[in-house]
C-alpha cells in the first residue's frame, strides 16, 4: 500500500457559540480519504440574517471563508474554489468540499449573527 492510501483528511467540527444557542452543524466529526467530496451542514434557528463559515488550521490561524447575508454571498478570495457554500434558505449555509486534500485538515465551524 502506498502512502496515499494510508493518508486521510480529518475534520473536527465544532458547534458555534455557547451551548444554549441554536446553531448546529453536522456531522460533528468527519474523517475521510483524500480525493473524496464531502459536505458539512450548518443550521440556525435564531432568525439571524447573516451566517459564516470559518476555518482554523494546524497553525491555529482562524480565517473567515464565507459570509452570507440576505442572499448576498461574500467569498474570501484566498479560499480554493473546491470549497463552495450553498444556502437553500436563510437558516442554512452548507459547505461543500470537492477533491479533499491533506491541507484541508482543520477545524471548521459555522456561526450566525443579526
From Swiss-Prot:
GO terms for cellular component: plasma membrane; T cell receptor complex. Keywords: Adaptive immunity, Cell membrane, Disulfide bond, Glycoprotein, Immunity, Immunoglobulin domain, Membrane, Receptor, Signal, T cell receptor. The keyword Signal applies. The keyword Aminoacyl-tRNA synthetase does not apply. Residues 22-114 form the Ig-like domain. Pfam families: V-set. It is found in: Cell membrane. It comes from the Eukaryota. Disulfide bonds join 42-110. Glycans are attached at residue 76. Coiled coil: none annotated. Residues 1-21 form the signal peptide. One of its GO terms (biological process) is adaptive immune response. Alpha-beta TR is a heterodimer composed of an alpha and beta chain; disulfide-linked. The alpha-beta TR is associated with the transmembrane signaling CD3 coreceptor proteins to form the TR-CD3 (TcR or TCR). The assembly of alpha-beta TR heterodimers with CD3 occurs in the endoplasmic reticulum where a single alpha-beta TR heterodimer associates with one CD3D-CD3E heterodimer, one CD3G-CD3E heterodimer and one CD247 homodimer forming a stable octameric structure. CD3D-CD3E and CD3G-CD3E heterodimers preferentially associate with TR alpha and TR beta chains, respectively. V region of the variable domain of T cell receptor (TR) beta chain that participates in the antigen recognition. Alpha-beta T cell receptors are antigen specific receptors which are essential to the immune response and are present on the cell surface of T lymphocytes. Recognize peptide-major histocompatibility (MH) (pMH) complexes that are displayed by antigen presenting cells (APC), a prerequisite for efficient T cell adaptive immunity against pathogens. This is T cell receptor beta variable 3-1. The lineage of its organism: Eukaryota, Metazoa, Chordata, Craniata, Vertebrata. The gene is TRBV3-1.
Amino acid at each position: 500500500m502506498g502512502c496515499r492510501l494510508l493518508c486521510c483528511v480529518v475534520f473536527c467540527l465544532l458547534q458555534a457559540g455557547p451551548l444554549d444557542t441554536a446553531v448546529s452543524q453536522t456531522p460533528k466529526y468527519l474523517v475521510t480519504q483524500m480525493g473524496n467530496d464531502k459536505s458539512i451542514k450548518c443550521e440556525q434557528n435564531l432568525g439571524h440574517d447573516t451566517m459564516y463559515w470559518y476555518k482554523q488550521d494546524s497553525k491555529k490561524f482562524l480565517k473567515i471563508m464565507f459570509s452570507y447575508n440576505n442572499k448576498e454571498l461574500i467569498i474570501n478570495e484566498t479560499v480554493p474554489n473546491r470549497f463552495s457554500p450553498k444556502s437553500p434558505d436563510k437558516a442554512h449555509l452548507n459547505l461543500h468540499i470537492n477533491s479533499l486534500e491533506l491541507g484541508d485538515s482543520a477545524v471548521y465551524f459555522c456561526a450566525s449573527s443579526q
